[in-house]
Amino acid sequence: MIFLNSMIKKAIFLKAKLQIILKVVSVLTTFKYHLLCDFYEFTMTQGYLKEGFADRICYFDIFFRKAPDGGAFAIFAGLEDILDFVENLHFDAEDLAFLRQKGFDEDFLKYLEHFKFSGEIYSVKEGAVIFANEPVMVIKARAIEAQLLETFLLCTLNHQSLIATKASRIVRAAKGRAVLEFGARRAHGGEAALKGARAAMIGGCLGTSNTLAAKLYGLKTSGTMAHAWVQMFADEYEAFRAFVKLYPKNATLLIDTYDCFLGLENAIRVFKEFGIEKGAVRIDSGNLCELSLKIRKKLDEAGLKECKIIASNSLDEKSIEILLKNGAKIDGFGVGERLITAFSDAIFGCVYKLVAVEIEGEIYPKIKISQDSFKTTIPHFKKLFRVYEGEKALYDELMIYDEVLENLPPNLRREELLSCVFKEGKRLYANKSIETLALFTKAQLSSLDEGLLDAKKTYELRLSPALKSLKKNLSQG
């Protein structure tokens, strides 16, 4: 009987989990992304078909040239959404009818009618620390298949990596204090709010105000009251009292609706009345440093030494760093618009570049040359390694795919960073919980030299002699 009850409980749990997964799929597929391509992807791919290139195997690298905010590195995010997209990408009758109206030939539309991505995708792990000019993802596929992925892949990686990187910067500035994502209302649309909340958790935020994101991605929710709650009552004390009576385990009171210190007095009165020692007060305006010092003093004098002070109000890593340097007594930060929009540097510049083609089984390197030397690409299908001494990352190595590795000194070890995550129409990468991804990112950050965290140092990317020579020769024509 005990065994039967256990099995029933397990079945109920699995059913509930499946329902959540189906709801996520439903929400994320209500809007069709099949045609989320820059128009030239279709003009080029029709041309590939006409010129006999449709089945030519191509290799594309995705990489970025500089990290946001002058940083030394970024956080890789968005892989799961990319694999979902690639696995399900097809073109239905409605898509084909639209393309027909745009003048595309029937032969090309017939090709698209039977489209399914059959290539391979190599990627770093989601949540990984990534550096400029290194391939973070490699697409190996027929020319048409590879080209049609470009826009969605860049759109996804550029947004989610940007937000994860920004969150990581803010979390590091908070020096162990809780950072909560409060940005939904300032995001650039609903999807940006959802994906941004997910990316922020990967970057180290502990919770989100975004209820739908919490439901879809299994995130911790955060949020208690706005000024409207206080204004709804005849006086502030009654507002606080009513709230704590309803939510005694979530007693965070916003004290700056009228006067911060009168609000604090009312909060202390209510906490005492209900015997709450571990509540919190939130301030959303004014001189946060000065206010926090005075609030902390009054809370301590009232015997509420475990009561937390939460601050919000257009915060980012720079303002948080200044607050803490000036001795602010703040226990946690609610960060909204400057996180969810990456306000200080709102562009993440991943690019998608052809680096090789395969003809009759031979791989031929390709290069894009520019008078701006930093825009000249690194050619060929490549492998990427990170070299460690103990648990500390020393440098990365980039080499041609078939090069023989040189032996390292016994105190060093290599880790290959690019692994196959999609092959033969199927994903090989299992989705991971946000908690798992956040812990991985935290471990990645702990492997970095302290100087990289504040961009006082740069991280070395070593090209193998053969790769360096190849790039030089191709650059010179």
What are the residue ranges of the model-derived segments?
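Buried, small/hydrophobic-residue-enriched core segments of structured protein domains
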Residues: 18-56, 66-68, 103, 109-118, ...
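Gly/Ser/Thr/Ala-enriched C-terminal appendages of enzymes
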Residues: 22-56, 60, 70-74, 300-302, ...
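N-terminal, Lys/Arg-enriched amphipathic/low-complexity engagement segments
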Residues: 58-113
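Short hydrophobic targeting helices and cationic amphipathic motifs
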Residues: 4-6, 14
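Short, positively charged
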Residues: 101-109, 189, 366, 399-402
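An N-terminal, globular interaction/scaffold subdomain
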Residues: 84-86, 123-126, 130
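Hydrophobic residues within beta-strands of alpha/beta enzymes
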Residues: 222, 281, 309, 331-333
